[in-house]
């Protein structure tokens, strides 16, 4: 992946702070450039690697995996593995690891800001005030978020955090569509109506995709 020497040193210091000395693992680290590397750059930079630590979305393709027979593990620093060819990894005997829930709270913090910004048109008023203008409302009065229905497409960690912010914070009604959510999770959220995709898009005033 893409990581700088400074970031690598920060990682080493973080490990050391909790009693883990990376040097005792007898490892060597190859650092790629900041931009997202190409297939060729990954192959050339990881010729002797046994583990690839992937930040960003580097293309860990079949070509890459077949060109690096020493690689045994690919660790993705994030939840998604969409840039990794999982079928090729399985065929090559490479174990792929990810970090479920990575930045879920941070994502759930940003989503309400964007939603409220759209409802209240804050970006427009911010620009105008910075220009020295103090415009009165030129559009319909914004709706009260407490009277709206928030539809969550995906009810993983980020979706559940967002539910807490809107339902517990504003009293907003929340519905969700997620074919993979377990019954155990559903039982923990009796206030959420789990609906079909068609019902989600017809009943929601706001839709947030997770």
Question: Which residue ranges define each predicted feature?
Answer:
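A short, aliphatic-rich alpha-helical micro-motif
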Residues: 43-46, 65-68, 145, 198-202
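N-terminal glycine-/charge-rich "phosphate-binding" loop or analogous flexible N-terminal tail
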Residues: 1-49, 173-175
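Rossmann-like dinucleotide/phosphate-binding beta-alpha-beta segment
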Residues: 139-210
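Structural motif corresponding to alpha-helix initiation and N-cap regions
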Residues: 5-8, 35-40, 58-62, 83, ...
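Short gly/ser/thr-rich secondary-structure transition/capping motifs
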Residues: 31-37, 54-56, 130-137, 187-194
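Short, polar loop motifs at secondary-structure junctions
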Residues: 4-5, 57, 178-183
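Phosphate/diphosphate ligand-binding glycine-rich loop within oxidoreductases
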Residues: 48-127
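Short, well-ordered alpha-helix to beta-strand connector turns
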Residues: 19, 49-50, 68-71, 148, ...
């Amino acid at each position: 992946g893409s990581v700088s020497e400074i970031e690598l040193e920060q990682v080493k210091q973080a490990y050391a702070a909790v009693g883990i000395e990376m040097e005792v693992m007898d490892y060597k680290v190859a650092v790629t450039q900041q931009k997202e590397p190409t297939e060729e750059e990954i192959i050339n930079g990881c010729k002797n690697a046994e583990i690839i630590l992937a930040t960003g979305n580097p293309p860990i393709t079949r070509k890459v995996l077949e060109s690096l027979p020493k690689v045994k593990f690919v660790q993705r620093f994030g939840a998604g593995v969409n840039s990794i060819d999982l079928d090729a990894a399985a065929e090559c005997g490479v174990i792929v690891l990810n970090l479920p829930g990575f930045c879920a709270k941070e994502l759930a913090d940003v989503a309400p800001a964007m939603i409220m910004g759209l409802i209240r048109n804050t970006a427009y008023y911010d620009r105008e005030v910075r220009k020295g203008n103090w415009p009165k409302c030129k559009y319909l009065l914004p709706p009260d978020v407490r009277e709206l229905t928030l539809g969550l497409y995906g009810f993983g960690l980020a979706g559940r955090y967002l539910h807490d912010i809107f339902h517990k914070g504003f009293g907003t009604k929340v519905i969700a569509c997620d074919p993979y959510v377990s019954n155990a999770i559903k039982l923990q959220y009796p206030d959420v109506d789990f609906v079909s995709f068609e019902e989600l898009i017809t009943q929601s005033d706001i839709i947030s995709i997770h």
